[in-house]
Design a protein with these regions (language model features):
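Flexible, low-complexity segments
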Residues: 2-6
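Secondary-structure junction/capping motif
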Residues: 7-12, 75-80, 110
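N-terminal cap/lid segment of alpha/beta-hydrolase-fold proteins
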Residues: 9-51
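Glycine/serine-rich loop-strand microenvironments at binding/catalytic pocket rims
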Residues: 12-16, 99, 128
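A general secondary-structure boundary signal
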Residues: 36-40, 88, 118
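Short, surface-exposed "cap/lid" segments of acyl-processing enzymes
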Residues: 47-101
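Surface-exposed, active-site-proximal loop segments in enzymatic domains
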Residues: 100-108
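Alpha/beta-hydrolase active-site loop
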Residues: 108-127
Length: 128
């Protein structure tokens, strides 16, 4: 569980045990975008009680989707499969999707914004 960052403000929204998995949900406020209201939800999956995690993997959903594409409420999907295989799984939710709140300029969000601002911030947080 990571509850802070030296890069930008981070809040631990929830820390849950779901069967054999641990699920930590973070809200990042990178502040690197022209829209300062952007906040990004990132879910970290791992095996409950496992201290040492493997290679990090970041999963991104497609348009009109959210983290549930990779991780169902019943613990099924690629995310849990990778976590059970020993990977350090991070599931990002883009601006205004899933647990990421809508930002002020929500109607103007673009894939270019995700690539230029959001993905580098998520990768830096995971790397930290």
């Amino acid at each position: 569980m990571q509850s802070s960052s030296e890069l930008f403000p981070v809040a631990l929204v929830s820390a849950e045990l779901r069967g054999d998995l641990s699920e930590d949900v973070y809200r990042l406020k990178p502040g690197n975008s022209p829209d300062s209201t952007v906040e990004l939800a990132v879910t970290r999956l791992g095996l409950a009680g496992q201290e040492n995690r493997g290679v990090p993997v970041i999963l991104l959903h497609g348009s009109f989707s959210n983290r549930r594409f990779w991780y169902s409420p019943r613990g099924i999907g690629l995310g849990p499969h990778l976590a059970r295989a020993g990977f350090d799984v991070w599931i990002a939710e883009m601006r205004g999707h899933g647990l990421s709140p809508r930002n002020q300029a929500y109607k103007h969000n673009s894939v270019a914004d995700y690539a230029r601002y959001d993905l580098p911030a998520i990768a830096a947080f995971v790397r930290e």
